[in-house]
Amino acid sequence: RVLFRSAQKTIVSTQIGSEFISDLPDQEDMRFRRHTNFGVGELGEDGYVTDFSWGYQLTLKSTYANVIGPVALTPSLTMKHGVEGYSSDDALQEDERSLGLGVGMSYKKLSADLSYTTYNDAKYSVVNDRDYLSLSTTYNF
C-alpha cells in the first residue's frame, strides 16, 4: 500500500481477446494447425484450432519519479492467460500462462528497460520450454 501511494502514477490495464471462426469443420472431420512439435494426433485430439478461443492479460505498472535524484523508475507486472480454445495464429492457447516482470529507468534523455517473462507448461504450447529476457536502451536527441 505504501508503494502505491508514493508512486507518481499507477496504471492497471486489462485486455480480453477472442477469436471466433464461424465455419470451422468439426475436429472429427478435419483438423487445422497444430504445431509439428506434437506430431500427428488422432481425430478429435486437443491442440488443433478451435472455433472459439479467448484469453486475457492483466498489467500493473507504476512510475516513481526522483527515486535517486532525477532518475525515475517504472516497475511492471504482466500476467497472460489463454483460458479456452486454440486460435489460428497461436496467440491464444488453452491453459497457457505467462508472467512478466519488468523495470524501466529514465534519466533526462536516456532510458532503459529490463524485463523477464516466463511461461508455464501448457500441453500444446510451443514456448513452454523457454523464458525471455529483454534489455533495451533509448537515447532521445
Which residue ranges define each predicted feature?
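Short loop/turn motifs that connect adjacent beta-strands in outer-membrane beta-barrel proteins
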Residues: 4-12, 65-74, 104-106
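Extracellular loop and loop/strand-boundary signature of outer-membrane beta-barrel proteins
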Residues: 42-48, 85-90, 121-125
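Solvent-exposed loop segments that connect transmembrane elements
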Residues: 23-45
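Transmembrane beta-strands of outer-membrane beta-barrel pores
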Residues: 16-22, 62-66, 79-85, 107-109, ...
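Membrane-embedded beta-strand positions of outer-membrane beta-barrel proteins
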Residues: 12-16, 75-77, 103, 112-114, ...
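Short sequence motifs at beta-strands and strand-loop junctions characteristic
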Residues: 46-54, 93-95, 127-129
